[in-house]
Every structure is written in C-alpha cells, then in structure tokens.
C-alpha cells in the first residue's frame, strides 16, 4: 500500500526508475507507470469486458502526447482481448464473470495504461486451479514484455512458482529474502512461516 501511495510511508524511501516517489500522490505515480491491481474486484460491474478496457484506453495518450484516436483505441483493444484470451467474453457484463475471467479483464485494463510496473495484491485468491495456472502464465507474459511485477500473496507455493525473488514478511518485518529455492530451505522461515511440512520442487524434486 505504501508503494502505490494508499498509505503514507512512516520511514524509508520509495524509488521508481531512480526517482523518489515517496511523497507523490497516487495519480502521479500512475502517470509514471505504476499500476495497482487490488484483491477486490476493480472492474466496472455494469459494463461489458470490452467497455471496461475501452474506458481506460480513452484516458491514454499516444507518443505525441495527444489522446488516442478511435482507430488506435480499437487496435489496442483488440490486441489486449487477444493477448489475455478474452475475445469470447468481450460482450459479457463484468458482474457475470468468473473469478478467472474477472482477473484477466482486470489485468487487460492494467495493461491498457501501458505500465512499467504492476502491483498485484493476492492475484491467486478466490480463483479456481485452472485460473491460477492462467494467471501465472499471464504474469510470465508481463515479464516477457519487460513489465515489472510485484506480488503480495499468502499462496506461497503459487507465488514461488511465479517469482524470481521473494521476501517473507512476518509481524511487519522482513524475515528473509532471496530466490524461492533458498527461502523454502531456510530453517527460520520454515519454523516461523512456512511450517516444517512445507515442500517446494527444486530441480524436479520435492524438498
């Protein structure tokens, strides 16, 4: 919440691309390329999937600093619908979507703003196993597009399968940091947070 500006930082500094954004309001951070996807539903419930995405595109500007033309909006809309595999539900009203469909629509809306970083709050919460796999694949797509992804989630296994670097936070303090394989074998982390029964696959084997 401190990173996106929802609450004021009581210490330290927050940098984005080398710029101090600690005291900037949310909208300024968004203009700099920082997008936040909350755990709660963030779609416009009464709008269709395509209108949800279009609403964000209509606020964007092109390389010349001018609002996107109708042609540019339609081209980007079609591209996002294809990339997130939601062409088949484009005319569905958002309130009728499943958990996985809603997540994909929300991520498409986030991408419509051409972000540099996307913060995902509990992306694996409230969705079925198939949707979890789809979301992991979408996050990989974001990484391939060179978009930074910061995830906060209590689903440790799915998060470990997805991230390159992780922090384990306990009682407001960073308990440990490192790659998932290291953290899964960290005795302190297992004792305080993961539990002794926790297993995580490394090099094809369960620990």
Model-derived regions, located:
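Conserved ABC transporter NBD signature motif
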Residues: 12-19, 32
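Short coil-to-helix segment of the ABC ATPase nucleotide-binding domain corresponding to the Q-loop/switch region
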Residues: 47-56
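Conserved catalytic motifs of ABC-family nucleotide-binding domains
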Residues: 114
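Conserved ABC ATPase "signature" region
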Residues: 68-89, 137-140
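Catalytic Walker B motif of ABC-type/P-loop ATPase nucleotide-binding domains
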Residues: 118-122
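Helix-to-loop junction immediately C-terminal to a conserved catalytic motif
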Residues: 4
């Amino acid at each position: 919440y401190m990173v996106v500006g929802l609450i004021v930082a009581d210490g330290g500094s927050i940098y984005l691309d080398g710029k101090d954004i600690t005291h900037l309001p949310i909208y300024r951070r968004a203009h700099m390329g920082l997008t936040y996807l909350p755990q709660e539903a963030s779609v416009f419930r009464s709008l269709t999937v395509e209108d949800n995405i279009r609403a964000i595109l209509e606020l964007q500007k092109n390389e010349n600093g001018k609002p996107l033309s109708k042609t540019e909006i339609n081209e980007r809309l079609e591209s996002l619908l294809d990339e997130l595999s939601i062409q088949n539900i484009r005319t569905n009203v958002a309130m009728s979507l499943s958990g996985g469909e809603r997540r994909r629509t929300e991520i498409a809306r986030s991408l419509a703003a051409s972000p540099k970083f996307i913060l995902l709050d509990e992306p694996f919460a409230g969705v079925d196993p198939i949707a979890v796999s789809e979301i992991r694949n979408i996050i990989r797509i974001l990484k391939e597009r060179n978009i930074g992804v910061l995830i906060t989630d209590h689903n440790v296994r799915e998060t470990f399968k997805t991230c390159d670097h992780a922090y384990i936070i306990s009682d407001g303090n960073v308990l440990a940091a490192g790659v998932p394989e290291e953290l899964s074998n960290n005795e302190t982390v297992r004792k305080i947070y993961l539990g002794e029964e926790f297993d995580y696959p490394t090099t094809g084997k369960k620990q």
